[in-house]
Amino acid sequence: MSASVAEPPPALSRKAEFKAAKAELLARFKSANHVTPLMHALSRATDDALRSLWQECGLPATLALVAVGGFGRGELSPHSDVDILVLLPDAHASELDERIERFIGMAWDLGLEIGSSVRTVDQCIEEASHDVTVQTSLLEARRIVGSTALFERFMLRYREALDARAFFQAKVLEMRQRHAKFQNTPYSLEPNVKESPGGLRDLQTILWIARAAGFGSSWRELDTRGLITDREARELRRNEGFLKTLRARLHVIAGRRQDILVFDLQTQAAESFGYQPTSAKRASEQLMRRYYWAAKAVTQLATILIQNIEAQLFPATSGVTRVLSPGRFVEKQGMLEIAADDVFERHPDAILEAFLLYEATRGVKGLSARTLRALYNSRDVMNNAWRRDPRNRHTFMQILQQPEGITHAFRLMNQTSVLGRYLLNFRRIVGQMQHDLYHVYTVDQHILMVLRNIRRFAVAEHAHEYPFCSQLIVNFERPWVLYVAALFHDIAKGRGGDHSALGMADARRFCREHGIEGDDAALVVWLVQHHLTMSQVAQKQDTSDPVVIKRFAELVGSERRLTALYLLTVADIRGTSPKVWNTWKGKLLEDLYRATLAVLGGAQPDAHSELKTRQEEALALLRLETVPPDAHRALWDQLDVGYFLRHDAADIAWQTRVLYRHVAADTAIVRARPSPVGDALQVLVYVKDRSDLFAGICAYFDRNGLSVLDARVNTTRHGYALDNFIVTQTEHDVQYRDIANLVEQQLAARLAESAPLPEPSKGRLSRLSRTFPITPRVDLRADERGQYYILSVSANDRPGLLYSIARVLAEHRVGVHAARINTLGERVEDVFMLDGTGLSDNRLQIQVETELLRAIAV
């Protein structure tokens, strides 16, 4: 007898057929530029499958199956939820419930992500009356199968109950709340293509409120209604098409619903659009720039449309409040409104005047839809002649020099694309992502964030944030010079070459064209050239060395330049990412500022006088602590000049008070306290020195989730290590006072052990670091005096990295004299001062460098 092949179960057969049909549609989409046909085809295929299941389950003709939400629009992304409503007549047999459950279960078995509700007409209206999400999903309801009469009765009741004004207010509030979750910016590193500001949800919201108001349900209908122009309708369709296509491609690449443009998928998504990497830009950076421009346009046009719809739904009871510029601008209900639609065509210089008035006029909270539209449609007016017009140059400088409102004005100029059309080089960096692992903003947003930070120094209500910066800027004449420097400090990013040098040339040209002369022009250009210098000196050089301070003072040359560079540096670091700035970096910069200011004021950077001053200050503090006179000598006699220069008087006094009775201790002494500088723990270690000591301490910190910010390593004349560490806990909301005792006990016990150094843990990289790894670099060279060797390490940050470095050095018996741990978001740029013994051997140098590269490799 011949064996027969068993038929697959009907459910499996249906699922296989549906999956094959969907796969065929997706295969066609891969070579298509437009996604709308795919979305409609997926919706039709889903309709057909659901109709078939409905009939198979024997559901009566008195019920109706209704598509809602995006499915109701007839648009399905490859892995979108399929939202359905089973509409029941007021009275129905209870046995229907079992059939409906079977229908929904079979839909799930088919592979559909079903979102279902089962309601009567009355229940639908009741739910919609107190839940705007339900009300919205029903707005685009579409019958798939079942009773037409029941569906039409439902839609009639729904429209009768719909209050267009209340719906508008609810959806606008919902949109504001949604935007707030994304920090009110489309410029996220990993934007949500659907939900982020400028995403698909904004476009859908506009069409929802327009449909509810009876104004139309497509961009063409809104154009016909006069709510948007032909040009705006084209822009909306173009950007909507791009966002829909991007979302669908994310779904296909991920093989599931995926609306967030995560790092891991950005390169594949870019390649699916045909972007190719160049020497200057990754493919992903090109895609992200396209996305940011689309989101920016959507945000701009959405603002115009919402204001226009609001004006029709809520006709103004009052007209013009006051004339702000005769024949050009008026204030209308708190908004800056053009006096006529062709103002910018007749008076191109009114374009920048609009922002000056917005900035300088109390009570004006924004630009009206009419003004925004006129700006949007005046792009051709903003040409070379407009940029060269002396009136515009004068107005631009006035905007920079106003006492308040500068940040808001520049943000609005960027949102409306006016800033990029006035400064063409600024336009080149709009939407340009920086995959350097520590900037979390696009270049244009970073620049405006730096401008905002400098402005906040000068605002009294923010003086508590950075008191020293606020104190300095109060006495800084013509602070607008700093704003110009902020605008240009990174304007040349992404062009290739040294962005500081290229930006210098742009800044010099701007100053020449805008009448900035003499010392002010020289300061702007110098700040752009050296905007990274102070940070590098403070974080990577030994600022206890008088030679370093003297060299930096010679570069700066004057107190005004020093203050300007300090303020720009603090604002710049704070403008890269919320994670990069910390109080320790603030202390390093402030210490460098004060030391340099003393030299500029005539003080000689003399090690002997500095040593004497610090010792006297430390002794005064010890007397307050009731430490016996001369008790400090036993310890201080064992310390070299370098120790006193590398520690301030407060640290010297604390360490002396802890150690003066234990100068010849047999066991390790470990003391910890909350850092006086800020949110960190200061750890003192005093123990007989050995070659693996630094590595052993780093191993303990690594195993216990403590990150080292700074290490100052000293060896006494009688062979003890006196090491000082500043560490932070990776967990949030840690109370350092609570963990100080635990660190003291555990670290002392660890140092008492004679166990070999453990293997470093290769901690996991973040997704950002995995997607955009940097090439690790190691540079080992003798310092200028030949006293120490300077080791510079640049790598992706990860747990265990510092210990991996320390272990290699310990294995080669290379002593660490000092360490500056500089974490910049997802990357580190660490600098170590090493004892030079043995490193003069080139073979050892090469071996150490090679092993370090291997240890820090991703």
Curated annotation (Swiss-Prot):
Q: What is known of its domains?
A: Has four distinct domains: an N-terminal nucleotidyltransferase (NT) domain responsible for UTase activity, a central HD domain that encodes UR activity, and two C-terminal ACT domains that seem to have a role in glutamine sensing.
Function statement? Modifies, by uridylylation and deuridylylation, the PII regulatory proteins (GlnB and homologs), in response to the nitrogen status of the cell that GlnD senses through the glutamine level. Under low glutamine levels, catalyzes the conversion of the PII proteins and UTP to PII-UMP and PPi, while under higher glutamine levels, GlnD hydrolyzes PII-UMP to PII and UMP (deuridylylation). Thus, controls uridylylation state and activity of the PII proteins, and plays an important role in the regulation of nitrogen assimilation and metabolism.
SUPFAM superfamilies, alphabetically?
ACT-like, HD-domain/PDEase-like, Nucleotidyltransferase, Nucleotidyltransferase substrate binding subunit/domain
Domain ACT stretches: 682-761, 790-858
Gene3D superfamilies listed in its UniProt record: 3.30.70.260, Beta Polymerase, domain 2, Hypothetical protein af1432, Nucleotidyltransferases domain 2
Q: Which cofactor does it need?
A: Mg(2+)
Task: From the Swiss-Prot or TrEMBL record, give the protein name.
Answer: Bifunctional uridylyltransferase/uridylyl-removing enzyme
Any Gene Ontology biological process? regulation of nitrogen utilization
Q: Which UniProt keywords apply?
A: Hydrolase, Magnesium, Multifunctional enzyme, Nucleotidyltransferase, Repeat, Transferase
Catalytic reaction annotation: [protein-PII]-L-tyrosine + UTP = [protein-PII]-uridylyl-L-tyrosine + diphosphate; [protein-PII]-uridylyl-L-tyrosine + H2O = [protein-PII]-L-tyrosine + UMP + H(+)
Give an example GO molecular function. Answer: phosphoric diester hydrolase activity
**Region named Uridylyl-removing:** 325-681
Q: Where is the HD domain?
A: 443-565
Per the UniProt entry, the Enzyme Commission number(s) are 2.7.7.59, 3.1.4.-
Q: Which family does it belong to?
A: Belongs to the GlnD family.
Provide the residue span(s) of the region labelled Uridylyltransferase.
1-324
Activation/inhibition comment: Uridylyltransferase (UTase) activity is inhibited by glutamine, while glutamine activates uridylyl-removing (UR) activity.
